[in-house]
Amino acid sequence: MESDKMMPGGLTEARPATPEIQEIATTVKSQLEEKTNKTYEKFEAVEYKSQVVAGINYYIKVHVGGNSYVHIKVFKSLPYQNKPLELSGYQVDKTKDDELTGF
């Protein structure tokens, strides 16, 4: 099976963030700021992995300034469900070299 195809439940290989991934990250930025009680001046999606579930989980590495990164998990429901994007998990105090993993 090619690495760029998604297997249900499996994580894809890490890929450079696209404008769509940046938009997803930006959409849940306020949810993350509320949960971490921090304001992120910089919020630049760098890379991502995705996972097909009953919708799609996006694991996104976000550069938040200096040497600081956060990993966010965003759930995108199936189109017919018409639900907003949900920040379903996050990891703070990450570095540029920390690998994105399922969490």
UniProtKB/Swiss-Prot annotation:
Gene Ontology MF terms? cysteine-type endopeptidase inhibitor activity
Q: Which Pfam families match?
A: Cystatin
**Signal peptide residue numbers:** none
Q: SMART domains, alphabetically?
A: CY
Instruction: Report the locations given in the UniProt record.
Output: Cytoplasm
Residue ranges of the motif Secondary area of contact = 51-55
Tell me which UniProt keywords the record has, alphabetically: Cytoplasm, Protease inhibitor, Thiol protease inhibitor
Principal subcellular localisation of the protein: cytoplasm
Q: What would be one Gene Ontology cellular-component term for the protein?
A: cytosol
Q: Which domain of life is it from?
A: Eukaryota
Question: Where along the sequence does the record put site: Reactive site?
Answer: 10
Function per UniProt: This is an intracellular thiol proteinase inhibitor.
Family note: Belongs to the cystatin family.
Q: What is this protein called?
A: Cystatin-A1
